[in-house]
């Protein structure tokens, strides 16, 4: 099966001929590196926009000499010459489709021993051809500022996704794969990677109903296509509240001790009896923090967390389509269907994991919320309580911001503000700090590169080459980190092109960028894009800087964790390279990076004041972090609630009563059952975008967080810059991509053999370990 998550196997390719080498060399890191003689070059390209525009040839006023020195070639997005326009994207998609068809025809008609030995390799190449269009289109439609490009990406994605689904139900391809894997004379000559990829693709064929009758296979294709379209519609509307404003009676707000300055900024309705509080911007959130009237807060909070009825229908349709698809595949639920091949192999183990985590956390959560309960009880003139159930019953989600603010007014802290801290963490400081960290623990650095004309989709995008001290360039990261209208609002790591081996028979490298292995063979450079929405602030005439709050530093570290997995998981086959691994394993490297982002030793090395250059003091950081970490267990429990909601929306009850299933009713009933910060007022489930991308697997974040915590304490707590332990993590986990069983990777890193086989005991061990 040709998935959108794929990689290569195999025998060592022979060293190319001299003529081929000359052709290849044109594509090696062709963007010129910024001179490394300037020590702050990474910091400077992110913190000094004038410098960046000048060296990148974007400044119309730069000198003739500068224009000559930095003369730029013309190309398309990601140095793909087709991608200069929306029509070029369509052309690239058509050419890729033609190449896929030619490779397919060759595979169908080659029954020789050589054809069998290269069959899995060619399946992987076929996958790569399709995924380089599908992944590219997923990126463009989420990020590109040109609507015409976005529309073209949507069209190409639909076309290629449908073609891929047809191949996933192709009986002849599946039968040939089975014959290769079941023939000892052939399989004994295949590499471990080829066998792994072959098994993965065979499992995916079977998940597509390959053994069922043609009508069922056709239905599978139709359902998969519809799920993709409905899911994209759903995700496109998760940022929008149900209405643009909410009406609050003037008499209620005027008597709620809200600042008159804030009230004067609010419009009123025609009769002048109600304030119209917008559900966008800062006003509603400011009111949640300052309004003493609980009914007003409740109304505001509900409006901010609700969506339109149309969006609820999209979610309901998505959930029901998935249930129908799972039923078609003879599974009791979509969760059962989706969890095949994951670390947590079945819904029961997942739900047991979540419940264990909740049981271990609920008392701590109630204890964290006790200060809110005490303040609210005092306002309501009710007796104080220490009973967990009573505390949780009293404290509602619209109380959190108001009473937290009130608590700190009554108990002033000497901790610095988030704004004061952010002055030490410019975007350039943080990227430079990440490069320094990777250099010390992995022997890898980030090197800025000048881009060719047309290579990026916005002048704000920076290119970083990823350089290994042993191998040279091993990958490329395009950083689209500054806020811009039209971008996805969520931070994201997009795989644009996976790493894989380049084979001697391949001669056209015009649409990819190529690297060289130590043995002289060549590989497709992994290309990824990191997307965030950080806001620059004007600090002087024509000069702005991007100051990151510590939560944003953590976000950037998280996404760079994914990036390092993509760069270091350089297998021969693209089906298992980098982040092409089990969904409940893929977040582990990124969440581990969050531990680095919270470590005082790391932060004091990175934090330099933008004006004075002074290093941030450890005491200053400790005081600030203490003041912001007081609801940690609440956050864990909230994540567990979302994971349980995801399981609830994909369990066996959906198909049994599909006509009557109500997503909002189900959501609110679950909220009441799980007790903490109960939301039985909004339809927030329609704003939960991860229900599409992480359907039945949202538990992965919590699961990987508990594992990452154990790895941090085992390897890096004593020394976050340990090269020995960085190499250990790279050697036993990162370098394998999706080739090695995740449980085996974790067992090797932790030196804990009992985890190797996974299963319910291993899941229980991980869940219980969260208590520490």
From Swiss-Prot:
Annotated S-S bridges: none
Activity regulation remarks: Stimulated by Fe(2+).
Keywords from the UniProt entry: Hydrolase, Metal-binding, Metalloprotease, Mitochondrion, Protease, Transit peptide, Zinc
Catalyzed reaction equations: Release of an N-terminal octapeptide as second stage of processing of some proteins imported into the mitochondrion
Main location: mitochondrion
SUPFAM superfamilies: Metalloproteases ('zincins'), catalytic domain
Cofactor comment text: Binds 1 zinc ion.
Subcellular localization: Mitochondrion matrix
Residue span of the annotated presequence: 1-37
Cofactor (UniProt): Zn(2+)
GO-annotated cellular components: mitochondrial matrix
Gene3D superfamilies assigned to the protein according to its UniProt record, in alphabetical order: Collagenase (Catalytic Domain), Neurolysin, domain 3
Annotated catalytic residues: 559
EC numbers on record: 3.4.24.59
Binding-site list for Zn(2+): 558, 562, 565
Family the UniProt entry places it in: Belongs to the peptidase M3 family.
Note: Present with 2690 molecules/cell in log phase SD medium.
Function, in words: Cleaves proteins, imported into the mitochondrion, to their mature size. While most mitochondrial precursor proteins are processed to the mature form in one step by mitochondrial processing peptidase (MPP), the sequential cleavage by MIP of an octapeptide after initial processing by MPP is a required step for a subgroup of nuclear-encoded precursor proteins destined for the matrix or the inner membrane.
Protein name per Swiss-Prot or TrEMBL: Mitochondrial intermediate peptidase
Organism, as annotated: Saccharomyces cerevisiae (strain YJM789) (Baker's yeast)
């Amino acid at each position: 099966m040709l998935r959108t998550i794929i990689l290569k196997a195999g025998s060592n390719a022979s060293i190319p001929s001299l003529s081929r080498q000359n052709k290849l060399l044109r594509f090696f890191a062709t963007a010129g590196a910024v001179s490394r003689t300037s020590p702050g070059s990474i910091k400077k390209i992110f913190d000094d926009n004038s410098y960046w525009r000048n060296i990148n040839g974007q400044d119309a006023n730069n000198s003739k000499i500068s224009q000559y020195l930095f003369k730029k070639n013309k190309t398309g997005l990601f140095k793909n010459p087709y991608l200069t326009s929306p029509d070029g994207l369509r052309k690239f998609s058509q050419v890729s489709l033609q190449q896929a068809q030619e490779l397919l025809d060759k595979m169908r008609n080659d029954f020789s021993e050589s054809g069998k030995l290269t069959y899995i390799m060619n399946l992987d190449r076929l996958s790569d051809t399709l995924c380089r269009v599908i992944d590219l289109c997923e990126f463009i439609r989420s990020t590109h500022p040109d609507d015409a490009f976005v529309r073209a990406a949507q069209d190409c994605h639909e076309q290629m996704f449908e073609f891929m689904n047809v191949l996933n139900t192709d009986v002849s391809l599946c039968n040939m794969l089975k014959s290769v894997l079941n023939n000892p004379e052939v399989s004994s000559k295949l590499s471990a990677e080829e066998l792994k990829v072959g098994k993965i693709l065979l499992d995916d064929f079977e998940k597509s109903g390959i053994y069922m009758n043609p009508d069922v296979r056709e239905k599978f294709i139709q359902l998969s296509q519809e799920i993709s379209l409905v899911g994209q519609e759903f995700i496109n509307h998760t940022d929008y509240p149900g209405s643009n404003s909410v009406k609050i009676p003037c008499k209620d707000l005027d008597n709620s001790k809200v600042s008159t300055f804030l009230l004067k900024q609010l419009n009123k309705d025609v009769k002048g009896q109600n304030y119209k509080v917008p559900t966008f911007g800062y006003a509603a959130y400011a009111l949640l923090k300052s309004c003493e009237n609980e009914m007003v807060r409740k109304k505001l909070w509900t409006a901010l967390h609700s969506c339109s009825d149309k969006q609820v229908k999209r979610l309901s349709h998505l959930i029901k389509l998935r249930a129908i698809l799972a039923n078609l595949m003879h599974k009791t639920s979509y969760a059962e269907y989706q969890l095949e091949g994951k670390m947590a192999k079945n819904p029961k183990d997942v739900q047991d994991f979540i419940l264990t985590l909740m049981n271990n956390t609920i008392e701590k959560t109630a204890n964290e919320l006790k200060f809110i309960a005490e303040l609210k009880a005092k306002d309501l003139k009710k007796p104080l309580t220490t009973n967990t159930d009573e505390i949780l019953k009293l404290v509602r989600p619209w109380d959190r911001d108001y009473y937290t603010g009130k608590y700190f007014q009554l108990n002033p802290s000497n901790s610095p503000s988030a704004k004061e801290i952010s002055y030490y963490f410019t975007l350039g400081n943080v990227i430079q700090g990440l490069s320094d960290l990777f250099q010390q623990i992995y022997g890898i650095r980030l090197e800025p590169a000048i881009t060719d004309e047309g290579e990026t989709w916005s002048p704000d995008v920076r290119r970083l080459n990823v350089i290994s001290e042993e191998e040279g360039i091993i990958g490329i990261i395009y950083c689209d980190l500054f806020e811009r209208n039209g971008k996805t609002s969520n931070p994201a790591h997009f795989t644009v092109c996976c790493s894989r081996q380049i084979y001697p028979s391949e001669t056209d490298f015009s649409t990819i960028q190529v690297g060289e292995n130590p043995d002289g063979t060549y590989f497709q450079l992994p290309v990824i894009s990191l997307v965030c929405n950080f806001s620059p602030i004007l600090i002087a005439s024509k000069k702005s800087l991007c100051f990151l709050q510590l939560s944003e530093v953590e976000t950037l570290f998280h996404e760079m964790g994914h990036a390092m997995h993509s760069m270091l998981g350089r297998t021969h086959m693209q089906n298992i390279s980098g982040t092409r691994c089990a969904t409940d394993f893929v977040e582990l490297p990124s969440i581990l990076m969050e531990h680095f982002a919270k470590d005082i030793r790391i932060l004091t090395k990175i934090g330099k004041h933008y004006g004075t250059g002074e290093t941030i003091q450890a005491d200053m950081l400790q005081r600030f972090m203490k003041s912001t970490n007081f609801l940690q267990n609440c956050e864990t429990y909230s994540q567990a609630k979302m994971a349980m909601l995801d399981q609830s929306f994909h369990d066996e009850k959906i198909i049994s009563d599909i006509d009557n299933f109500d997503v909002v009713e189900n959501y609110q009933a679950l909220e009441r059952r799980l007790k903490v910060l109960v939301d039985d007022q909004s339809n927030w489930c329609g704003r939960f975008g991860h229900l599409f991308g992480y359907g039945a697997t949202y538990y992965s974040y919590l699961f990987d967080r508990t594992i990452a915590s154990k790895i941090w304490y085992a390897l890096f707590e004593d020394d976050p810059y340990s090269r020995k332990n960085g190499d250990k993590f790279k050697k036993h986990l990162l370098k394998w991509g999706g080739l090695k069983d995740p449980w085996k990777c974790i067992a090797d890193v932790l030196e804990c053999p009992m985890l190797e086989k996974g299963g319910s005991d291993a899941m229980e061990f991980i869940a219980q370990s969260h208590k520490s």
